[in-house]
Amino acid sequence: MTINYQFGDVDAHGAMIRALAGSLEAEHQAIISDVLTASDFWGGAGSAACQGFITQLGRNFQVIYEQANAHGQKVQAAGNNMAQTDSAVGSSWA
């Protein structure tokens, strides 16, 4: 009986997570544009409230990016580790 694991799928999933993390920058910039368009709500684009909101938004996006990217790396590493272990065990049984 042969069991076939799709380690490439695990690697691709990790790569997709990392790519999605990278695409967050475009979303971040779109939100900043909307915030600046509605900056009167905070007292104008140059106001401390508006700039503070933009700064905090940037920090939040940075944390999300870092966590998603790190998770993608861990998924890829886990897939690679499983593939190496499977290969080592398989060759020892040959």
Swiss-Prot record:
Any one of the GO CC terms: extracellular region
Annotated protein name in UniProt: ESAT-6-like protein EsxI
Designated gene of the protein: esxI
Subcellular location: Secreted
UniProt family annotation: Belongs to the WXG100 family. ESAT-6 subfamily.
Source taxon at top rank: Bacteria
Main location: secreted
Keywords from the named record: Secreted
